[in-house]
Swiss-Prot record:
InterPro entries: Bet_v_I/MLP, Bet_v_I_allergen, MLP-like_ligand-binding, START-like_dom_sf. The lineage of its organism: Eukaryota, Viridiplantae, Streptophyta, Embryophyta, Tracheophyta. One of its GO terms (biological process) is defense response. The gene is MLP423. This is MLP-like protein 423. One of its GO terms (cellular component) is cytosol. GO terms for molecular function: abscisic acid binding; protein phosphatase inhibitor activity; signaling receptor activity. It comes from the Eukaryota. It comes from Arabidopsis thaliana. Pfam families: Bet_v_1. Belongs to the MLP family.
Length: 155
């Protein structure tokens, strides 16, 4: 098995694409409030937190399976196609992966959304597992965001 790879996952949710995309854009405020077990804080260290070049420091809660802190830089945002890419630039994850770049795309589908997530990585050593735990955490978060948004709609 090589040191580099890519993981992909698709998740269908009931929330409309526009609503889900807005929630992702407000993750700095929304995630620690709505999902305190997963996110303790998200601080903006540079930029506005959403534009390319922005840097965010994420302190994870007990629900995070791999790391407790990471810094990520927003690499690209495509508002029209509801897509954003980020790179991990600091924190414990760099002990396992020399590089990690994630991409999230929100696509309208049948009144809900199709979420596509991919993670490109380069491991620090052959013994390191592929980051399936990170992929699974992303899927869990997508489902939690959907549940949260659906509760807000029905409230």
């Amino acid at each position: 098995m090589g040191l580099s790879g890519v993981l992909h996952v698709e998740v269908e949710v009931k929330s409309p694409a526009e609503k889900f995309w807005v929630a992702l854009g407000d993750g700095i405020n929304l995630f620690p409030k709505a999902f305190p077990n997963d996110y303790k804080t998200i601080q903006v260290l540079a930029g506005d937190g959403n534009a390319p070049g922005s840097i965010r420091l994420i302190t994870y809660g007990e629900g995070s399976p791999l790391v407790k802190i990471s810094a990520e830089r927003i690499e690209a945002v495509d508002l029209e196609n509801k897509s954003m890419s980020y790179s991990i630039i600091g924190g414990e994850m760099l002990e396992y992966y020399k590089t990690f770049k994630g991409t999230i795309t929100v696509i309208p589908k049948d009144g809900g959304s199709l979420l596509k997530w991919s993670g490109e990585f380069e491991k620090t050593a052959h013994e390191i597992d592929d980051p399936h735990v990170i992929k699974d955490f992303a899927v869990k978060n997508f489902k939690e965001i959907d549940e949260y948004l659906l509760k807000q709609t029905s409230a």
